[in-house]
Amino acid sequence: MNQDTLHRYLFDNADVRGELVQLQDSYQQVISAQEYPAVLQVLLGELMAATSLLTATLKFSGDISVQLQGNGPVSLAVINGNNLQELRGVARWNAELADDASLTDLFGQGYMVITLTPDEGERYQGVVALDKPTLAACVEEYFNQSEQLPTGIWLFADGKQAAGMFLQILPSKEDHNPDFEHLSQLTSTIKAEELFTLDAESVLHRLYHQEEVRLFDPIDVSFKCTCSHERSAGAIKTLDQAEIEAILAEDGKIEMGCEYCHAKYIFDAIDVAALFANGQTSTTQQ
């Protein structure tokens, strides 16, 4: 089965909607960019699944960023995506991390910033504290604050695969919904192994075999980096001229690296001169 897909589903006999995402190749591309400690591999997987689930709730074309920051040994973990389910991500850390480190161990006094940037319209940003025991609970708190709709989030990752599930009461329905509470209890019985080995239809049947579930066509999820020659050239043009000359004098080139995919863009003295002369340059990617 394709292990990089998101499925939406509805319950015909309940005012509740759901999503299920399963990631493998895209997840591997994110965590293979650096030698991440095991705990960060898991965190990035959960963050990817959460971002995919969040993206599927958007009703516009545009971008989303889910960013974790704090004053702990991990200063940043972020997944960027868009309405096409194209994701990329990175984390930064400065100390050895235990495999069983908690969110507080990783980020100290941390917070999650979710930024929605529509192609048309105003940007929206929501901030919640990383003061819950799990990332899933923090994402649930975001929904409680932003949409004020009862929402359940389940996230899993093991360094090889990542997955997540989402349940939410349909808008305009009563906040107290016994169907939602019942379905949340059923969903809470899901095991990571089931999400990693079964297709979506089998997972939903195993969880909700007594419910009437309508499963929609899958949506592909992929890794896509937005780095380019042009962006790297633009970054060089923001540097001070003296700094550029010093780098060229010492190294003979300026090397721009992408921390998301580790692509390298190399500009020699001729490239840089052409860049400032007419805004164009020939560059080499390695």
From Swiss-Prot:
Function text: Redox regulated molecular chaperone. Protects both thermally unfolding and oxidatively damaged proteins from irreversible aggregation. Plays an important role in the bacterial defense system toward oxidative stress.
Keywords, ordered alphabetically: Chaperone, Cytoplasm, Disulfide bond, Redox-active center, Zinc
Name of protein: 33 kDa chaperonin
Entry similarity comment: Belongs to the HSP33 family.
SUPFAM superfamilies associated with the record: Hsp33 domain, HSP33 redox switch-like
Single Gene Ontology MF annotation: protein folding chaperone
Any one GO BP annotation for this protein: protein refolding
One CC-aspect GO term: cytoplasm
Alphabetized Pfam families for the sequence: HSP33
Cell location: Cytoplasm
CDD domains: Hsp33
Post-translation changes: Under oxidizing conditions two disulfide bonds are formed involving the reactive cysteines. Under reducing conditions zinc is bound to the reactive cysteines and the protein is inactive.
Cysteine pairings via disulfide bonds: 225-227, 258-261
Organism lineage string: Bacteria, Pseudomonadati, Pseudomonadota, Gammaproteobacteria, Alteromonadales
